[in-house]
């Protein structure tokens, strides 16, 4: 009985710490809002064939990737026509392991650079994000 009381006391003491760790790691989408790369001005875009969006700096990409809750059933991946391993991409990106994230994207897609430009991710992976369905704004993927 004494051992049980000691165990229970320790558990009650560390439970708030465990909850804080879980919230900091798994529920970042509550604290960090959705953000997309800024679009270039229309006047400039009409004069060239460059990207529509400005570059998404790696710090912002890491921050947005960290919003992924790594849900049990990744609807983003289910709704991807290539079945890209999106949750793992996001995890690697959030950890700053961009080369590994790129290599992972190449394992299911021979031309991820092209796909990233023409894929309607707002209707596919981002549009089916569990976080989007909960009202917190989708994880920015493309």
Regions found by a protein language model. Name each.
Residues 21-142:
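Ferredoxin-type iron-sulfur electron-transfer modules and their immediate structural context
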Residues 10, 17-20:
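Charged/polar low-complexity intrinsically disordered segments
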């Amino acid at each position: 009985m004494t051992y049980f009381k000691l165990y229970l006391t320790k558990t009650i003491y560390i439970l708030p710490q465990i909850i804080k760790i879980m919230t900091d790691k798994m529920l970042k989408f509550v604290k960090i809002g959705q953000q997309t790369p800024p679009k270039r001005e229309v006047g400039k875009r009409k004069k060239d064939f460059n990207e529509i969006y400005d570059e998404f700096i790696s710090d912002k990409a890491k921050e947005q990737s960290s919003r992924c809750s790594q849900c049990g059933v990744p609807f983003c991946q289910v709704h991807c026509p290539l079945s890209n391993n999106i949750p793992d991409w996001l995890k690697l990106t959030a950890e700053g392991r961009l080369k590994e994230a790129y290599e992972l994207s190449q394992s299911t897609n021979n031309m991820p650079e092209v796909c990233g430009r023409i894929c309607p991710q707002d209707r596919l992976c981002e549009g089916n994000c569990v976080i989007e369905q909960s009202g917190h704004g989708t994880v920015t993927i493309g």
